[in-house]
């Protein structure tokens, strides 16, 4: 089965589908599935754009709204995970995944699905240690910090994925697993991105949480994006069982959707031709969700996952046969994912733009139905319910505390200040950008003009690199575990302090001179050559 893999989408759906159609004609082949590795930007309207962690001057409506409204339909079944530039308010409606538009499926905070027998898993967001052990507490309206922490990976998702035991064919993450660069051509990578050198040498580039999952899940393929460069690697896993054939993972990271950039690759994946062409739930994953339904935290308080350390009565939440039977019964013996997309808010109208539109809290009926069938908790609805209850309590307390010497103004109830989620890896923004945007009126860029697909797309196979380029996975594991352990204590060591890692450049990536920021909007598609590489 031909599967198209896309790096950072950045809302450029029209261009991505046009490129796939061009390649199908050129190679006389048929692509059956598109996988997007984050920064999808499912922006429906002006309110959604204000929920993306990008400054006003870089906001572009792009083309997703056409697929949301039904003006267009995705020509290929599309599955995506979230990155660090998303309309977080919309994705927050679907914590367990769901359709964001007809034929376009979001995998949720983490998820596993099946298509024609191919098992596909994924985790959304990027790793930041100061938010890793918190719950999903973010709510509308987002603050300066929560608009970023909303897309940070949480330990609960990693814990759930580590309960999986059945083989995985494909896994998606936005940021790279830490240490994966040791299993590929590091010299070539650093030639393209020299400013990664220090982090590669220190083994701090990438996500330790993703690295932990890579060592546990050991999928046949792992696809990522985020760093805006194509990079292939081959990792041979170790086995502790005598006689067991060790597994191997082919890793591929891809660039962002720009002309003359390697942002898309077609791969051949074995599939079961007898299986349905409908997207299906994964039974083991649903069983894990059901088993972990009581592990719930919607506060910024840190918490630790159950371990076999004498402190927890249960630490193994892997899928049991009994739970699997319950799930099958709950779903009426049908694992097909229902095509139950529905619009939950108004769509952008280019003829009548609403610059002052503000995003509001919405409970998505897809999530309501999914949770009702499996007996799960809708995190998004729970946050809304808690806010209403807290509001009622606050009103009662205010009525009872007349004459109190305490000044309520001294006690902030804004939880956003509890998470200073400064992200040095982000593409466009930091404090300077936010200050520059103050007082600016929101302006919406029109969708980019027609685009001619790049004819130089490389369709070569994923490279299998020689063993001499590999390093011991023990070294990688030690580094990963160190940072995951540090994330537990980071709250008391100065939560939210920005790291000293170098900023990820947008252009002038050879490292010469100062950092230059270039907009990834229509001007690039009109007359730009390669982006200073």
Swiss-Prot record:
Q: Which of this chain's residues are annotated to bind a divalent metal cation 1?
A: 8, 10, 228
Q: Which domain of life is it from?
A: Eukaryota
Annotated region (Lariat recognition loop) at: 124-154
Bias category Acidic residues: which stretches?
A: 427-440
Check the record and name the Gene3D superfamilies matching this protein: 3.60.21.10
Q: Does the keyword Zinc apply?
A: yes
Cellular component GO terms held in the UniProt record = nucleus
**Residue spans with biased composition (Polar residues)?**
412-423
Q: What is its EC number?
A: 3.1.4.-
Keyword Hydrolase: yes or no?
yes
Q: Region Disordered: which residues?
A: 392-454, 468-533
State its role: Cleaves the 2'-5' phosphodiester linkage at the branch point of excised lariat intron RNA and converts them into linear molecules that can be subsequently degraded, thereby facilitating ribonucleotide turnover. Linked to its role in pre-mRNA processing mechanism, may also participate in retrovirus replication and have an antiviral cell-intrinsic defense function.
In the record, the note on similarity to other proteins reads: Belongs to the lariat debranching enzyme family.
Q: Per its record, how is this protein called by name?
A: Lariat debranching enzyme B
